Design a protein with these regions (language model features):
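Perimembrane helix-loop-helix junctions
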Residues: 288, 323-359
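Periplasmic/ER-lumenal interhelical loops and adjacent helix-loop junctions
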Residues: 171, 177-185, 347-434
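Membrane-helix boundary/interfacial segments in multi-pass membrane proteins
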Residues: 58-67, 143-148, 249-263, 382-404, ...
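Extracytoplasmic
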Residues: 13-16, 569-761
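Membrane-interface alpha helices of multi-pass inner-membrane proteins
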Residues: 288-317
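Membrane-embedded, hydrophobic transmembrane alpha-helices
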Residues: 1-114, 447
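Active-site lumenal/periplasmic loops and adjacent helix-entry segments of GT-C-fold
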Residues: 125-266, 286-292, 584-596
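Hydrophobic, aromatic-rich transmembrane alpha-helices
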Residues: 413-473
Length: 761
C-alpha cells in the first residue's frame, strides 16, 4: 500500500492533465461542473490524438516539454471562454454601457447550505465509488509488478517504445513492437501514459493509469445519471454501484486489463452525458422554431463533442461504436419525433421531413458501412470462437467475467438482479399499471423519485429537468444482445457486428455496464422512494392521531445512507474477495493464474539484467515465458517485444522460433544471430500458457543444449539467462536505436527491413 502512496503525485498529475484542458471549455456552455468534469477527459484524449498525428508530420518529438504546453494553453483558452461566457450571461452582453466592470458582472451569490450539502454528498459518493473500485488493486498488487496478461504486456512495451522513439502516432508509432513494421494501432492511452513515465517507471505509471481510469469511470457515470433523471438518490447511487461492478472496472482494469479498450469504455459515459445535454438543447430550439439558428447556437458544444469523439477513437475505435450502441435509441427517437411533426404540417411544410428521414437513414446506414471497412472486418477475423446459446443467454442480461464464484459474488449478483428489476419497472413505467386511471403522482411522472427536482436539476443545469426517459432500457437491450451474440455460436452476423470488439464478450460487457448502472441506480432510488413513502405515511398517521399538523415529510437521507450501506455490506463491498483474487491472478507472482509468465524469482532476475548485461544487449527468448518483460523491467531490447511474433523480418523470425535449438549444428541460426546482433538467450522450462504448451508455438526456443556455446549469466526460479558464445563475436543489436526503430541487421551492407506496411495486431 505504501508503494501506491508514493505514486500519489503521478495520480494527481494525470487527473489534472485529463480534466483541466477540456473542463473550462465545456463549463462555458454547460452549467454543471459534474458534467464538465465527467466529459473533460475525452476532450483531452481528443487533443492528444490530434497532436500524436500532427507531431510526426512536423518532426516534433513526443515528450512532456512539447505536449504539456499545448494542454496548458487549452486550459487557459477554456478559462477565457468560460469567463467571457459568464460575463455575457450576467451582464446581458459584452457592452458595459458605462457600468463599472465589477458591478456589471455582479457579486456571485454564495450557494446555500442545502445545496452545499448536496454537492458534498455527490462528490463524496464519487470518492467512495472510486475507493471501492480501486481497493482490490491497491491492496493486492505491487505497482512495480507488470500485469501478467497478453495485451498489457504489449501496451506497456508500447509506452516504452514511445519514450525511445518520441513518436506516438497511431500510424506506426509502435513500430518497434513489430520489429520495424509500421502498422496502425490506436495509441491514445500509450501517448498519454508516456507523458508521465520514465524509462524505468513504465510499469508503475501504467498501473497508476488504471486508478485514473477508475476515477474517470465513476465520475462519468454520475454525470450521465445526473442528466437522465432528477433523482438525487439515483445520482448518489450511480458511482457506488459503478465502482463495484465486476466487468468494468474490476475485470477491464485489473484481470483482463485491456488499457486502450478500457480507456474508451471509461470515456463513453461522460461523452454520452454531453451529447444528451446538447441534444436536448438543440431539440428545444428546434421545437421553438429557431430553425437553422438552432444548429448555429450549438456549434461550440458540437465542436467539443466532436473532439471528445475523436478522443474515443484515439483510445480505441470500438469506443465510437460503443457510444453509438448506447445512444442509437434516443437519436432515432428524436429523429422520429421531428419527422412526424414535419409530416403533420400542411403543404410544403412536409418537405422538412426529408432531412430528418435522411438523418435517420444516416444513423443506421453509416455505422453499417463503417463495419464493412477492411480495417474493421480485419478485427472481426480475429480467431475467437463463440460458445453456445445457453452461454449467450447467461451472460446477456447480467454479464459477469470469469471471476471466482464466491458466496459474496452470489450475494452481489442477487442484489444486482433486484436493483435491475426495480430499475426496469420504473424506467418502463410498469408501476403505473397498478394505479387507478387518472391517478398519477406528478413527481413520479417526471421520474423525480426524490421529489426535489429543482435542487437536483441545479446539479445538472439550470435548464428545466426532463422526465426520466425510457430509452436507457432500449440501450440496455441492444448491448445485452451484443453480449449474447459474443457468446453465441459462430455466425456471419457475429463476425460482422462484433468486429470492433474483436468478437470479445468481455470487452462488450464493460459497455453494457453503463446501461446497467443507470437502471440499477434508478432501481435503488425507487426502493428508497418506497421506504420513504411508507415512513412518511406512518409519521403522518401518528401526527393525525395526536391531533398535530401532518404536513410533514420524513427525512430521506437516513434511508439513502441505510440502503446504500445495506447494498455495500451485503455484497461484501462488491464481492471484494473475488475481485481481490482476480487482481492476484495477474499481479501477484506467487498466485498467478493461467496467464502467468514469470515467478517472483524470475522477475527479480529480470530486474537484475540492468546490471548483468550491457545496455546494447539484445535478448532472445519466448515472449510468453517472461522474455517480453526485459524491456520494461531491465531496459534491454527483446527480439520479440510482444507476445505475438510479428516482426518485419519474417525469415529470421522463423529461423529463431523453429530452429534456434539447432544453433550448434545449423549455420543459418548463427547467421541470423550475428545479423541481428543477438547477445543473450533467455531460457525457461516448457509449460502451459492458458491451454497450450509454449513449445508448440515456438519449438526452437525449447530443448536448447546450453552445455556448450553458452555462458550462464544469471538465473531466477526456473529461468536462466545465457550469453551466446556459439556464434563467435556478435556486434550487439540492442540499445537506444533498436528501441527507437526496432531490431535490424547490424552487418555492414545488409538490407534494410521492408518498408512501411499496414496491418492489425
Amino acid at each position: 500500500m505504501l508503494a501506491w502512496w508514493m505514486l500519489l503525485p503521478t495520480l494527481l498529475a494525470m487527473l489534472v492533465a485529463l480534466v483541466l484542458p477540456g473542463f473550462m471549455w465545456l463549463r462555458a456552455g454547460v452549467r454543471s461542473s459534474l458534467v464538465a468534469i465527467g466529459a473533460a477527459p475525452a476532450f483531452t484524449f481528443g487533443l492528444i490524438t490530434a497532436l500524436s498525428v500532427l507531431y510526426p508530420a512536423l518532426d516534433i518529438p513526443w515528450e512532456p516539454s512539447t505536449v504539456m504546453p499545448v494542454l496548458g494553453m487549452s486550459a487557459v483558452g477554456g478559462a477565457a471562454a468560460w469567463a467571457l461566457s459568464y460575463f455575457r450571461r450576467v451582464n446581458g452582453g459584452f457592452a458595459l454601457n458605462g457600468v463599472p466592470f465589477r458591478e456589471a458582472i455582479g457579486v456571485r451569490v454564495p450557494i446555500g447550505g442545502r445545496q452545499a450539502a448536496i454537492r458534498t454528498a455527490t462528490w463524496g459518493t464519487i470518492v467512495v465509488g472510486f475507493l471501492l473500485a480501486a481497493w482490490p488493486l491497491m491492496s493486492v498488487a505491487d505497482p512495480a509488478n507488470p500485469v501478467q496478461q497478453w495485451d498489457p504486456t504489449f501496451h506497456q512495451n508500447g509506452v516504452h517504445a514511445i519514450l525511445y522513439g518520441k513518436d506516438a502516432s497511431p500510424f506506426g508509432g509502435l513500430h518497434e513492437l513489430y520489429g520495424g513494421r509500421r502498422v496502425y494501432y490506436p495509441t491514445g492511452w500509450h501517448a498519454f501514459v508516456a507523458l508521465f513515465a520514465r524509462f524505468d517507471s513504465v510499469v508503475q505509471t501504467a498501473n497508476v493509469s488504471s486508478l485514473v481510469l477508475m476515477a474517470v469511470w465513476v465520475t462519468g457515470l454520475a454525470a450521465l445519471v445526473s442528466v437522465l433523471t432528477g433523482s438525487r438518490t439515483a445520482l448518489l447511487a450511480a458511482p457506488i454501484i459503478g465502482g463495484m461492478l465486476p466487468n468494468m472496472p474490476a475485470d477491464a482494469l485489473t484481470m483482463y486489463n485491456q488499457w486502450p479498450n478500457s480507456t474508451g469504455t471509461a470515456l463513453v459515459p461522460g461523452v454520452a452525458a454531453v451529447a444528451i445535454v446538447v441534444g436536448r438543447r438543440l431539440a428545444a430550439d428546434l421545437s421553438d422554431g429557431c430553425g437553422a439558428r438552432s444548429f448555429a447556437r450549438r456549434i461550440p458544444q458540437g465542436l467539443f463533442l466532436l473532439l471528445g469523439c475523436l478522443g474515443l477513437v484515439g483510445a480505441h475505435p470500438s469506443a465510437a461504436f460503443s457510444l453509438l450502441a448506447f445512444l442509437a435509441a434516443p437519436l432515432l427517437m428524436v429523429i422520429g419525433f421531428f419527422t412526424r411533426t414535419s409530416l403533420a404540417r400542411e403543404g410544403r411544410g412536409q418537405l422538412a421531413a426529408l432531412p430528418w428521414i435522411g438523418a435517420g437513414l444516416a444513423v443506421v446506414v453509416l455505422p453499417l458501412i463503417a463495419l464493412s471497412s477492411p480495417k474493421i472486418q480485419a478485427m472481426g477475423r480475429y480467431p475467437r470462437r463463440g460458445s453456445s446459446w445457453s452461454e449467450a443467454f447467461s451472460h446477456a442480461l447480467l454479464p459477469y467475467p470469469p471471476f471466482a464464484q464466491t458466496t459474496a459474488m452470489a450475494w452481489w449478483t442477487l442484489i444486482q438482479v433486484l436493483l435491475l428489476i426495480a430499475g426496469i419497472i420504473v424506467t418502463a413505467r410498469l408501476h403505473t399499471l397498478m394505479r387507478r386511471p387518472g391517478v398519477r403522482d406528478a413527481a413520479d411522472a417526471r421520474c423525480d423519485l426524490d421529489g426535489d427536482e429543482d435542487e437536483a436539476a441545479a446539479l445538472v443545469d439550470n435548464d428545466k429537468a426532463a422526465p426520466m426517459p425510457a430509452w436507457p432500457l432500449v440501450s440496455y437491450l441492444i448491448l445485452a444482445f451484443l453480449t449474447a451474440l459474443a457468446y453465441a455460436p459462430d455466425s456471419a452476423l457475429r463476425t460482422y457486428l462484433l468486429a470492433p470488439w474483436y468478437k470479445d464478450g468481455r470487452r462488450i460487457m464493460g459497455v453494457e455496464d453503463i446501461a446497467l448502472t443507470v437502471l440499477m441506480a434508478v432501481g435503488a432510488a425507487a426502493i428508497v422512494h418506497l421506504f420513504h413513502a411508507a415512513w412518511t405515511s406512518s409519521l403522518r398517521r401518528i401526527l393525525v392521531e395526536r391531533g398535530l399538523d401532518d404536513n410533514v415529510e420524513a427525512p430521506r437521507w437516513p434511508l439513502q445512507v441505510g440502503v446504500g450501506a445495506i447494498v455495500v455490506l451485503m455484497s461484501s463491498f462488491g464481492a471484494i474477495d473475488a475481485r481481490n483474487s482476480a487482481v492476484a491472478s495477474v499481479y501477484d507472482p506467487t498466485r498467478l493464474g493461467k496467464s502467468g509468465m514469470a515467478s517472483e524469482d524470475e522477475l527479480a532476475m529480470l530486474r537484475r539484467m540492468a546490471s548483468t548485461t550491457d545496455s546494447d544487449a539484445l535478448i532472445l527468448g519466448d515472449p510468453i515465458a517472461g522474455a517480453a518483460y526485459v524491456e520494461t523491467l531491465a531496459g534491454r531490447k527483446a527480439v520479440f517485444p510482444q507476445l505475438s511474433t510479428v516482426n518485419a523480418d519474417g525469415a529470421s523470425q522463423k529461423v529463431l522460433t523453429q530452429r534456434f535449438r539447432d544453433i550448434a549444428d545449423d549455420p543459418e541460426v548463427c547467421e541470423v544471430v550475428r545479423n541481428l546482433g543477438i547477445t543473450h538467450f533467455y531460457e525457461e522450462e516448457d509449460g502451459s500458457y492458458y491451454n497450450i504448451q509454449r513449445s508448440n508455438r515456438h519449438p526452437g526456443l525449447y530443448g536448447v543444449d546450453t552445455s556448450r556455446g553458452f555462458e550462464l549469466v544469471d538465473e531466477g526460479g526456473t529461468a536462466k539467462l545465457w550469453k551466446i558464445t556459439a556464434c563467435g563475436w556478435v556486434t550487439p543489436g540492442g540499445g537506444a536505436q533498436a528501441f527507437a526503430d526496432g531490431i535490424r541487421s547490424v552487418q555492414p551492407g545488409a538490407e534494410e527491413p521492408e518498408g512501411p506496411q499496414s496491418g492489425d495486431e
